[in-house]
Amino acid sequence: MSTISAALVMQLRERTGAGMMECKKFLIATNGDIEQAIIEMRKAGQAKADKKADRVAAEGIIVIARSSDERTAVMLEINSETDFVARDENFTNFANAVADVALTSLPKNIEDLSNQALSSGATVEQARQELVAKIGENIKLRRLEKMHCDGVIGYYLHGSRIGVMVALKNGSEALAKDIAMHVAASKPMVVSRDQVPAEAIENEREIFTAQAKESGKPQEIIDKMIDGRINKFIDEVSLLGQPYVKDPNIKVGQLLKEKNAEVISFVRYEVGEGIEKKEDNFVEEVMAQVRT
């Protein structure tokens, strides 16, 4: 890439908090690859924080339905264009009805779910289209997760924007719900440290190595520093290694051991994560209307 646009520089600045010239320098070095630029800036200690990385721009709700025996559950993300519609009773009623149908039919995927019949007789897709026509916004069934276990499934909804399901062995529903609440707050990547992807560890090792070399300390000390930071990183992203949100003096793994319980799996959804929403440019909209 021969030139780096001002818009790209601004985007990197918003995400890292670094100066304009630093952002441009790293973008040039990475040929305009913003994600690689962030990694290189972290290595050099320039990125204050990837402030915008976790920001998402999509509206909607998370809904969960669970069977009466607490062994089967489904979770859905259903998107709308605005938060106003996401709070609309027609929208929330539709979302909950779809979750109930998903629990009953356990569809293979969203397409399969769309063909299932609601109590009204209409299919999910027909009801979606009717709702779109009624409220004037696009509505999308974005994703579906099914969970089943021989133990107990606990779930937690933080408002309607974050949802978590946890499958627990040898534990109570109350404990499963507490763990789900912890997952909602602490966002672990995996259950246990052995499940952390090797690629994620290697990426962090490269960053820590680059940072440690700047200290000027002997290689033996640097190696110990890196190992310590890697272990800390693994604990931070592993559910069992995290301090329990209700009692930070103990880790989740210790709590489960005391309760003789085991987390089989968990799933965490947050509305809009991974979706980039087009920002409105009202000046351009008005000018386009004038030109027509």
UniProtKB/Swiss-Prot annotation:
Q: Where is this region: Involved in Mg(2+) ion dislocation from EF-Tu?
A: 82-85
- Matching InterPro entries, A to Z? EF-Ts_dimer_sf (IPR036402), Transl_elong_EFTs/EF1B (IPR001816), Transl_elong_EFTs/EF1B_dimer (IPR014039), Transl_elong_Ts_CS (IPR018101), UBA-like_sf (IPR009060)
Q: Where in the cell is it found?
A: Cytoplasm
Per its UniProt entry, which superkingdom is the organism in?
Answer: Bacteria
Kindly list the GO molecular function terms attached to this UniProt entry.
Answer: translation elongation factor activity
Family classification: Belongs to the EF-Ts family.
Q: What is this protein called?
A: Elongation factor Ts
